[in-house]
Amino acid sequence: MIDNTFTLISRIDGEIRRFITEELAKEGITDIVPSHGAIIVELMKHGQLPMNELARHIDRTPQTVTSLVKKLVKSGYVETGKAPEDNRVTMAALTDPGARLAATLCRISEEIYEHQYQGIPGDEIVVLRSALARMHANFAENGFKDTESMG
């Protein structure tokens, strides 16, 4: 059976990424990509995190997170340092510019939420999210683990 579910998901993903990029550009932020957003938001929610824990939170490999965090450090949004109790552990935390970026990303996320569910009743949103979560789990259960950076 051929259906266009993947095509629709891919198009929505592209539209959301484009919207995020355009909204960031309006704020003068051109040095990050949407995939950095997950790191910024997790650090906003949890404060300072060990890099390996951050990787688990955003479902990426430690290598991918290291690469993304290095870019955020270079841009001044994140700082890293060794954990006081174990110098083998690298911690990541938002800087002041990173906290401002997090607030901007939250505003953009709210706008996306309003647009993506416009005209869709709440009970249908619940069903949609449940089906998408199950689809994601199906891939994970069958060895299709998402391990690559998306940006």
Predicted regions and their residues:
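N-terminal positioning helix adjacent to the helix-turn-helix/winged-helix DNA-binding module
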Residues: 1, 35-36, 97, 124
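N-terminal helix-turn-helix DNA-binding core of bacterial DNA-binding proteins
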Residues: 19-64
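Short amphipathic alpha-helical segments with heptad-repeat character
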Residues: 6, 10, 59, 99-106
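A short alpha/beta connector and helix-capping loop motif
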Residues: 136-144, 148
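Charged, amphipathic alpha-helical coiled-coil/dimerization segments
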Residues: 48, 70-133, 140
